Regions:
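A general structural-boundary detector
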Residues: 2-3, 98, 133, 162
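N-terminal secretory signal peptides and thylakoid transit peptides that target proteins
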Residues: 3-26
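Residue-level marker of regulatory loop/turn positions in helix-turn-helix DNA-binding domains and
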Residues: 8, 99, 138
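N-terminal pre-ligand scaffold of iron-sulfur
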Residues: 17, 23-24, 34-134, 171, ...
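C-terminal single-pass membrane-anchor helix
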Residues: 30-31
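Short Fe-S-cluster ligation motifs
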Residues: 137-195
Length: 195
């Protein structure tokens, strides 16, 4: 018994002749999305803008004498967020130039990618090996690195995202010097985490 010719339906033969369309379309879609994501992560990083501090109660962080050398670090919690205070070698956008040529910057330690904690990575070779990031000759200094997905933030550039999946800079903490002590008096809002 044969089927009538000229039927407009999808026959088994036609289906088998065109089965390849599905995996090709899926592969093209996957590669298209990966290309979009890679370009967004590589070229879509936001620069550091003017500080947008929200006032918060003053909190003593450290004495200036505790930050006696460049890249001295004090970790603290402010506005329910883990943060870090750094003595940096030059003025930083959103940082503080304290008396005696002391330059300070403080950042939230919550990575702007998925919220893991960032830490100060002092050794450029560790950044190159563990984070697959080698800074240029002018940026051979400690960086803030997230070990979850290997994002790197430059404290000298105001916490700007330099490498990895994070596209937004770290929120900055407003600093003040009162006498010989450093205080936090405000913090930038936490960004919506990226994916």
């Amino acid at each position: 018994m044969s089927r009538p010719q000229g039927g407009g339906g999808l026959s088994r033969r036609r289906l088998l002749e065109r089965w390849w369309i599905l995996p090709v379309a899926a592969t093209a879609g996957a590669f298209g999305y990966m290309g979009y994501y890679a370009s967004r992560v590589t070229f879509g990083k936001k620069g550091v803008g003017a500080p947008d501090f929200r006032p918060r109660p003053a909190q003593k962080l450290a004495a200036l004498s505790d930050l006696n050398a460049e890249w001295s670090e004090v970790n603290f919690t402010y506005d329910a967020r883990p943060c870090t205070l750094l003595r940096v070698p030059q003025s930083v956008p959103g940082g503080l130039d304290a008396p005696g040529s002391v330059r300070l910057a403080a950042f939230s330690r919550v990575c702007t990618h998925l919220g893991c904690a960032v830490n100060l990575v002092r050794d450029p070779e560790v950044l190159a090996f563990a984070f697959n990031y080698r800074a240029g000759p002018q940026d051979q200094h400690p960086q803030l690195g997230c070990r979850c997905h290997y994002s790197v933030f430059d404290p000298v550039r105001g916490g700007e995202a330099m490498f990895g999946k994070a596209t937004l800079p770290l929120p900055r903490v407003r600093l003040e010097v009162r006498g010989n002590d450093v205080y936090a008096t405000g913090i930038e809002p936490a960004p919506t985490l990226s994916t």
